[in-house]
UniProtKB/Swiss-Prot annotation:
It catalyses: 7-aminomethyl-7-carbaguanine + 2 NADP(+) = 7-cyano-7-deazaguanine + 2 NADPH + 3 H(+). It comes from Caulobacter vibrioides (strain NA1000 / CB15N) (Caulobacter crescentus). One of its GO terms (molecular function) is preQ1 synthase activity. This is NADPH-dependent 7-cyano-7-deazaguanine reductase. Belongs to the GTP cyclohydrolase I family. QueF type 1 subfamily. The keyword NADP applies. Substrate binds at I71, E72, S73, H90, E91. SUPFAM superfamilies: Tetrahydrobiopterin biosynthesis enzymes-like (SSF55620). Its EC number is 1.7.1.13. It holds the Pfam family QueF. It comes from the Bacteria.
Amino acid sequence: MTDLNVTQLGRVVDAPESPEAAVLERVPNPQSDVLYLARFVAPEFTSLCPVTGQPDFAHLVIDYAPGDWLIESKSLKLYLTSFRNHGSFHEDCTVKVARKIVEIAQPRWLRIGGYWYPRGGIPIDVFWQTGPAPEGLWVPDQGVAPYRGRG
């Protein structure tokens, strides 16, 4: 295997204390000449309410069309874990995750759906994307139904 210049893959690594301390890594995309979509799903994303300190939970769906770089998935897992003790509003967490991926991987296109579970009786869904999807890119539905209580 070639040297991928990563610091976490294949090693025992402690969970980062915060998103600022986390290291999100990239690896070369061997299919950089092909337009395709890659999807990461994090069904148990957690963060803290910045006011009450209570836990918040979300189902994140991250779709991106890689360019020259791929997001290394272990580093993404650790980056997402770093939010566990981080106080931030739902909207901020969702967009922060997406913008960090864009900064590191420089994809052709990215969108994120943050499907937050209710607190105070209100579910919050947050959506962000870098712009229109490239022509010819197959973009499937994110597959997360709107929240429905017992009603």
